[in-house]
């Protein structure tokens, strides 16, 4: 027996088009938030790199201002300007000399740039698909309104 392929009810088609539109809209929002987070990460990495580079010219110990939160700072003395402690992930902290720490930051910056580029491409793709879904939704909605008259 051959199956009878009846067209989908119009309200179901409209609902599917709206779901597709909503999905792409949500993905755009998520990707935008992730790009914003990556931008802040890149800024923090740049600041850390700049600070480490300035430490390279220091000798012995140095007076520094340390942020302790909520726009509050404390004066402190940096006992060792040749080595720093670097979080390498998973709660693991290792001692590195300043040039090695700078290389680590540069590698992280490249990784952030690569992820940002991939995310920007996805964002562009989602935007195009959302635009197509929106056009289809408007077109189909207008078609249904025309039938109601």
Stretches with model-predicted labels:
Residues 1-88, 92-149:
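Intrinsically disordered, low-complexity regulatory regions in eukaryotic proteins
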